């Protein structure tokens, strides 16, 4: 097994930065994961390795056929054939979705009139679908961070509870999902252990899919793809080339950096190019035409080659010129010095406007370094992982970040008690989940799995799963419920293996007060322009955007606004709340 792993990944597929002592790296990392949990998302910076033999591209290498995927109520309605099918007692035909108190509940599908295909794929039988639930190794980065929120036992109990609930509600053609805990054997940055664990999941557990994986190496999901096993929520900063490489097995819950940077670039071109830097902190800059610089994360060797080439072409097409283009590696002990060097370069370049496309830790040091040398430009937020959250924004130099604005794929925040995952759990079970802090994080990949299996139809394969999600009716599009869609309905580049498919506009208000994503009261918050209005990914923002205008902006909602409120249904028959 060891020799096979080494042969598949001669370069290891691991992060390029040097090993860092546990105490030195855990401080900022604990903060980040606490935020991730509160926001209901886990973000990783993703390294890519060769696909190895047998990995599908665009689903072409996956065996099985997309024929026979489920018919949704929306499809039948468009064809005028709804009367030809049995939609089951759980379908609300007024919405075409299951009777669940959710915005964007799973779609209704026509009940199958024939037995399912039985053992259609590894991990699939006529009655069960085996799914691995990845548990990080004790003492590893993810375990240590998660310990600051909910215990592994509480999270696993909540996973099993959601699985039991969805098995009762979502029709899976006579099958039930069986979640099997899988204990990782190595750290989150160990590619050899990651590949060995993937082999165990595929060949020992015979899993159809894995929920989660190691956060600091792509070896696990790459190997699962090679072995034709799905991996959901295994990496959320994957460049689009990574999704193409591992298709149809890898699925994410945040837009690819390709999507975010393209949308940010279009905002820059439509709103900023050729105009004075009126939002800069230095008065002398406000009467100068904007000059642009970019600061972005990368690895050694670079992993965003295709994306960088695309952006270079787009820069040329729009006549946008960068006076400085800075890249850095995420080596935490070196970030303060690296930030000081970058800040000096930015000031020397006379850039009025800095486009930031990196991790959420670097701005802590970069804004401090810029302030130390009296450099106060405009900061353009591209929505890369967590830089668009109030919890992190409060850690950036406030004199600097008072001039930050841009895009975000995240929804306008709601109070934790209003989180959809929590209200759904309480609707079914009549009590709070064991993992109350991580409940949103836990539900997301489980729901994606169930919906994909539901839409795949009776002959379940990875390709049918892919085609089912590609045909899923898109949901959402309101301030608190981003538009979710995949394939042709997701964010470009297409077909999409991650979502949301829209974004909103934000700016930092250093004087606003309220609670952040963790529920902590404080000063400094992101404001959402025009009440958090969403814009389709891949399309320019029209008109003139008035950043730094409080009129019409919000920092959050006490409850979902009209149009984004979930429907109300009685308890599901047989649920604990209904006395079952």
Regions found by a protein language model. Name each.
Residues 11-36:
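N-terminal export and membrane-targeting signals
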Residues 153-160, 168-246, 253, 328-336, ...:
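Beta-alpha junction/loop-to-helix N-cap segments that form part of ligand/metal-binding clefts
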């Amino acid at each position: 097994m060891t020799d096979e792993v080494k042969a598949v990944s001669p370069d290891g597929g691991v992060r390029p930065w040097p090993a860092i002592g546990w105490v030195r790296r855990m401080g900022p990392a604990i903060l980040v994961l606490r935020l991730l949990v509160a926001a209901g998302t886990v973000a990783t910076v993703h390294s890519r390795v060769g696909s190895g033999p047998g990995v599908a591209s665009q689903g072409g290498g996956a065996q099985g056929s997309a024929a026979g995927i489920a018919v949704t109520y929306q499809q039948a309605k468009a064809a005028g054939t709804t009367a030809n099918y049995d939609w089951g007692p759980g379908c609300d035909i007024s919405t075409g979705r299951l009777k669940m108190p959710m915005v964007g509940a799973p779609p209704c599908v026509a009940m199958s009139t024939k037995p399912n295909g039985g053992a259609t794929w590894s991990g699939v039988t006529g009655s069960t679908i085996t799914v691995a639930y990845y548990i990080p190794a004790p003492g590893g980065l993810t375990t240590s961070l998660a310990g600051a929120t909910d215990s592994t036992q509480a999270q696993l109990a909540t996973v099993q509870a959601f699985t039991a609930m969805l098995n009762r509600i979502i029709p899976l053609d006579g099958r039930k999902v069986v979640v099997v805990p899988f204990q990782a054997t190595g750290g989150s940055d160990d590619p050899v252990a990651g590949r060995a664990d993937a082999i165990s999941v595929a060949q020992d557990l015979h899993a159809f899919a894995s929920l989660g994986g190691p956060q600091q190496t792509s070896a696990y999901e790459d190997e699962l793809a090679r072995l034709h096993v799905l991996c959901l929520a295994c990496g959320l900063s994957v460049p689009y080339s990574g999704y193409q490489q591992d298709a149809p097995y890898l699925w994410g819950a945040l837009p690819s950096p390709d999507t975010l940077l393209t949308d940010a670039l279009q905002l820059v071109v439509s709103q900023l190019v050729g105009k004075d830097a009126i939002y800069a902190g230095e008065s002398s800059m406000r009467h100068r035409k904007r000059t642009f610089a970019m600061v972005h994360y990368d690895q050694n060797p670079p992993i965003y080659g295709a994306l960088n080439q695309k952006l270079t072409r787009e820069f040329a097409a729009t006549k946008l010129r960068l006076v400085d283009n800075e890249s850095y590696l995420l080596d935490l002990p070196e970030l303060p010095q690296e930030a000081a060097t970058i800040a000096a370069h930015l000031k020397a370049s006379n850039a009025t406007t800095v486009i930031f496309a990196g991790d959420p830790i670097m701005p802590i040091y970069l804004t401090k370094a810029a302030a130390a040398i009296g450099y106060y430009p405009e900061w353009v937020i591209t929505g890369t992982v967590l830089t668009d959250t109030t919890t992190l924004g409060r850690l950036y130099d406030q004199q600097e970040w008072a001039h930050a604005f841009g895009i975000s794929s995240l929804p306008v925040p709601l109070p934790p008690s209003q989180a959809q995952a929590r209200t759904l759990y309480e609707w079914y079970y009549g009590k709070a989940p064991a993992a109350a802090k991580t409940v949103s994080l836990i539900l997301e990949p489980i729901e994606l799995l169930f919906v994909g299996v539901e839409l795949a139809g009776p002959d379940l394969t990875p390709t049918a799963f892919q085609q089912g999600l590609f045909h899923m009716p898109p949901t959402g599009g309101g301030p608190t419920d981003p538009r979710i869609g995949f394939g042709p309905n997701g964010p470009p580049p297409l077909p999409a293996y991650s979502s949301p498919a829209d974004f909103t506009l934000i700016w930092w208000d250093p004087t606003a007060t309220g609670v952040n994503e963790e529920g902590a009261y404080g000063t400094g918050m992101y404001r959402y322009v025009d009440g958090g209005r969403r814009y389709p990914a891949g399309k320019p923002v029209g008109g003139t955007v008035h950043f730094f205008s409080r009129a019409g902006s919000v920092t959050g909602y006490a409850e979902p606004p009209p149009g984004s409120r979930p429907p109300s249904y009685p308890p599901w028959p047989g649920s604990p709340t209904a006395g079952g």
